[in-house]
Amino acid sequence: MTALNELTLAEARDGLKAKDFSAREIAQAHLDAIDRAKALNAYIVATPDRALKMAEVSDQKIAKGEARPLEGLPLGIKDLFATQGVDTTAGSKILEGFEPHYESNVSSQLWRDGAVMLGKLNLDEFAMGSSNETSAYGKTISPWRRQGSYAPLVPGGSSGGSAAAVAAHLCLGATATDTGGSIRQPAAFTGTVGIKPTYGRCSRWGIIAYASSLDQAGPIARTVQDCAILLGSMAGHDPRDTTSVDMPVPDFEAAISRGVKGLTIGIPKEYRVEGMPAEIQRLWDQGADWLREAGATIKEISLPHTQYALPAYYIVAPAEASSNLARYDGVRYGLRVPGKDIAGMYENTRAAGFGREVKRRIMIGTYVLSAGYYDAYYVRAQKIRTLIKRDFEAAYASGVDAILTPATPSAAFGIGEMASADPVEMYLNDVFTVTVNMAGLPGISVPAGLDAQGLPLGLQLIGRPFDEETLFAAAQTIENAAGRISLPKAWWA
């Protein structure tokens, strides 16, 4: 029999409904797995008492025939989502010990639907990173290893704890956020599925902000179906978030069985970047073949401003971050380091509380917003953003239903491998994903195969605004063709 923590979310839902096991039993199975997996450092804090109390409520609901959509399903929460009464740190020393008195909209909707909270998941500090190496609470280690090697690998970032926990069976699914690829890249690195919904599909209320015009919440799970189930609960209008869109939430789970017959899938020629590994190109071609065999038409398209997306993103995002992170000053909450006066306290607190990568991005952002450089950098980057959005609009107007690209330019790299590199080398991990955030579009990463060293690789599908249903249908087609990747054996236990 499959261990309870190794079930998919859909299988666990069906098992709980059939009373094959209790919510308490599946919660305890996950808590035991978390205890055995401390070497991965996927969780910043586990919440066993809360999990078991929530599971008991779920068992009572199931016994009365009052089960809610996610009744009794144990989930991990990225530590960027405010959780009432539970430390919420954003992976930063400056928020050490901060316990919110409120719950994020996304997590409150999950609890409304009966989900069980296992704990808070590790991440790059303030979601700034592509490897989960910038967390003040230690690096998260990927459950994957290269064949014949014991060298630790990164799980991707910033949602590395979410992806690692899902891949290592430490939760059935996890919340995550995506500003430039922070759901899709770690999902690709860990053989999991991750979707960044359309900007505005999920409320940002109660999520610690990085770049407000780019941030969007979404799920990471082990299958396309599981992601569809979770997004159905996470999405929805919230009047507290002025960017939250007031439109009905579709039945995403029903969409996975639609298939792709009659759809047109675009292949952007600009994504064939110089130096792309041959195995990434082969996987991309294979993905197009799978969709063609399932009845889709494959069409080459042009997204001419793609080459400017990464530099424009690394102007817009740090600019917004420098503004958003100005609120952390040691006055009302979090770390406070005394100084000789109020200005000294601000300086000392921020110097001690922020990590190196966060300081770098705050400085870049402050620089591009300064009077002498605002027009030269920030305004120009926003103009590029508009052109990128128009490229996608033109592609969809030409009859394309979704766009297929690689999710990442490589498989996962080793812990510390990029530590001494130019920061731009790390930023290049987002080369295939940032355009989606700049245009506010939905994008999903789905596992499609393994590289020569046995590490997972993902394909990305990009959709029309608020057409996540087509993405789920196409992603399910790829998952069916590729087969589900066997997740790694528990070498850490």
Swiss-Prot record:
The keyword ATP-binding is assigned to this record: yes
Keyword Membrane set for record: no
Which UniProt keywords are present, listed alphabetically? ATP-binding, Ligase, Nucleotide-binding, Protein biosynthesis
GO cellular component, as recorded: glutamyl-tRNA(Gln) amidotransferase complex
State its role. Allows the formation of correctly charged Gln-tRNA(Gln) through the transamidation of misacylated Glu-tRNA(Gln) in organisms which lack glutaminyl-tRNA synthetase. The reaction takes place in the presence of glutamine and ATP through an activated gamma-phospho-Glu-tRNA(Gln).
Annotated family: Belongs to the amidase family. GatA subfamily.
Q: Which HAMAP family match?
A: GatA
Q: What is this protein called?
A: Glutamyl-tRNA(Gln) amidotransferase subunit A
Write the lineage as a comma-separated list: Bacteria, Pseudomonadati, Pseudomonadota, Alphaproteobacteria, Hyphomicrobiales
